[in-house]
């Protein structure tokens, strides 16, 4: 690191000739290894770093930011806090935090669109009648028109419609967590295994051909270990459309993961990573990571990596996009955003628990003062 007032590699210097007052941090250099104790460069007092050549600076929060060159006439693209678009099945249930259908699972805004008539059974079959297919296309188009940065689905079986979805939009489309398979496979040696966890082990078998076609990966390869969660106590609530008691399921799912990893430990093909196919498995990802010390890829990591490709980096990006979002997710009810003439085509209805939650949020909002209403912004469409 350059000393106070010194010229750095690009000919840059600190305006006040010193790097001062790093809040709650003490920089230590041992040999050639240096680190910040609190893992961040924070609150540089009265210092903003400017690099003339690349127009870089430290902002007031101590974050290193890049600015476009002063003589660059190119238009600066300022993202309006990149958001995610989610295609929903015609199926409602009380989602747990961590589920794709729970907006609180994401650190960015989410727009949902239900496809009337697209039930779980239809999605699992991989075939869409012409009318449902058109509604699916219309739903992708609608999400695109909302300006979402990328699109996904709320069921792993949406892998069947990956090609259809991407033919409708130029936005990145990862309709299933399985879209991560090529990257995960590339990360490990051929003699290292990857465990694929799914809600039901048998249900993944018919998807082999579409996975090979879309991902270039053969799930029949011996490097994959297919693990079904159908016998995990408490997880049957997923199949029943009921609320899952996450706390009660965690120890059982963790035990399943530990046993799966242990079974292959010490063999010629140890398990090196886990991928959750089902969109209702991410609530358990952190517990499994902690127990197995293995990477766990799921539908949330899939969406995060997709959105990160269009996000401003909070450390050295350009636009501070993250400051343009108020942190309140756009509220969504089952069937919202479906055109009125198609609402009658919905096969399922809103889950009673979700109705109660919505009504409770309305009652809470109605108790706010006018000033408080103004402060939360965008009125009753926020939860």
From Swiss-Prot:
It comes from Emiliania huxleyi (strain CCMP1516). Belongs to the aspartate/glutamate racemases family. ALMA1 subfamily. Mediates cleavage of dimethylsulfoniopropionate (DMSP) into dimethyl sulfide (DMS) and acrylate. DMS is the principal form by which sulfur is transported from oceans to the atmosphere and is a key component of the ocean sulfur cycle. It catalyses: S,S-dimethyl-beta-propiothetin = acrylate + dimethyl sulfide + H(+). One of its GO terms (molecular function) is dimethylpropiothetin dethiomethylase activity. Its EC number is 4.4.1.3. The keyword Lyase applies. Keywords: Lyase. This is Dimethylsulfoniopropionate lyase 3. It is an enzyme of class 4 (lyase). It comes from the Eukaryota. Homotetramer.
């Amino acid at each position: 690191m350059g000393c106070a007032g010194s010229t750095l590699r690009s000919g840059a210097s600190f305006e006040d000739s010193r790097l001062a007052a790093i809040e709650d941090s003490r920089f230590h250099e041992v040999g050639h290894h240096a680190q910040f104790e609190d893992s961040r460069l924070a609150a540089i007092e009265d210092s903003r770093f400017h690099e003339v050549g690349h127009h870089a600076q430290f902002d007031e929060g101590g974050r290193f930011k890049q600015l476009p060159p002063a003589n660059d006439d190119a238009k600066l693209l300022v993202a309006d806090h990149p958001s995610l678009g989610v295609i929903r099945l015609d199926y409602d249930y009380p989602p747990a935090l961590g589920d794709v259908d729970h907006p609180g699972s994401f650190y960015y805004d989410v727009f949902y669109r239900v496809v009337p008539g697209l039930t779980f059974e239809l999605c699992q079959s991989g075939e869409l009648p012409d009318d449902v297919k058109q509604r699916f296309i219309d739903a992708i188009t609608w999400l695109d028109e909302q300006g979402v940065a990328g699109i996904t689905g709320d069921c792993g079986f949406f892998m069947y419609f990956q090609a259809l979805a991407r033919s409708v939009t130029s936005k990145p489309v990862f309709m299933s967590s399985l879209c991560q398979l090529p990257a995960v496979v590339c990360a490990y040696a051929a003699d290292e295994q990857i465990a694929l966890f799914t809600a039901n082990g048998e249900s993944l078998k018919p998807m082999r051909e579409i996975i090979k076609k879309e991902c270039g990966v053969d799930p029949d390869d011996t490097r994959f270990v297919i693990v079904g969660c159908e016998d995990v106590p408490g997880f049957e609530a997923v199949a029943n459309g009921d609320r899952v008691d996450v706390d009660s399921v965690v120890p059982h799912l963790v035990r399943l993961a530990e046993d799966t990893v242990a079974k292959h430990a010490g063999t010629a093909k140890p398990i090196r990573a886990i991928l959750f196919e089902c969109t209702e498995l991410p609530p358990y990802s952190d517990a499994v990571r902690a127990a197995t010390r293995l990477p766990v890829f799921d539908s949330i990591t899939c969406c995060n990596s997709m959105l990160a490709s269009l996000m401003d980096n909070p450390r050295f990006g350009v636009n501070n996009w993250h400051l343009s979002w108020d942190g309140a997710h756009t509220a969504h009810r089952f069937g919202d955003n479906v055109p009125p003439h198609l609402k009658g085509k919905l096969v399922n209805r809103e889950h009673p628990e979700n109705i109660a939650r919505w009504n409770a949020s309305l009652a809470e909002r109605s108790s706010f003062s006018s000033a408080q209403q103004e402060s939360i912004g965008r009125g009753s469409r926020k939860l």
